[in-house]
Amino acid sequence: TDGKEGEFIAEGGGVR
């Protein structure tokens, strides 16, 4: 959740 690939946007990251 910090901007990695396949991560769900929850803390300010985002999916790629």
UniProtKB/Swiss-Prot annotation:
<keyword id="KW-1064">Adaptive immunity</keyword>
<keyword id="KW-1015">Disulfide bond</keyword>
<protein>
    <recommendedName>
        <fullName>Fibrinogen alpha chain</fullName>
    </recommendedName>
</protein>
<keyword id="KW-0356">Hemostasis</keyword>
<keyword id="KW-0094">Blood coagulation</keyword>
<dbReference type="GO" id="GO:0005576">
    <property type="term" value="C:extracellular region"/>
</dbReference>
<comment type="subunit">
    <text>Heterohexamer; disulfide linked. Contains 2 sets of 3 non-identical chains (alpha, beta and gamma). The 2 heterotrimers are in head to head conformation with the N-termini in a small central domain.</text>
</comment>
<dbReference type="GO" id="GO:0007596">
    <property type="term" value="P:blood coagulation"/>
</dbReference>
<dbReference type="GO" id="GO:0045087">
    <property type="term" value="P:innate immune response"/>
</dbReference>
<keyword id="KW-0175">Coiled coil</keyword>
<comment type="function">
    <text>Cleaved by the protease thrombin to yield monomers which, together with fibrinogen beta (FGB) and fibrinogen gamma (FGG), polymerize to form an insoluble fibrin matrix. Fibrin has a major function in hemostasis as one of the primary components of blood clots. In addition, functions during the early stages of wound repair to stabilize the lesion and guide cell migration during re-epithelialization. Was originally thought to be essential for platelet aggregation, based on in vitro studies using anticoagulated blood.</text>
</comment>
<keyword id="KW-0391">Immunity</keyword>
<keyword id="KW-0964">Secreted</keyword>
<keyword id="KW-0399">Innate immunity</keyword>
<dbReference type="GO" id="GO:0002250">
    <property type="term" value="P:adaptive immune response"/>
</dbReference>
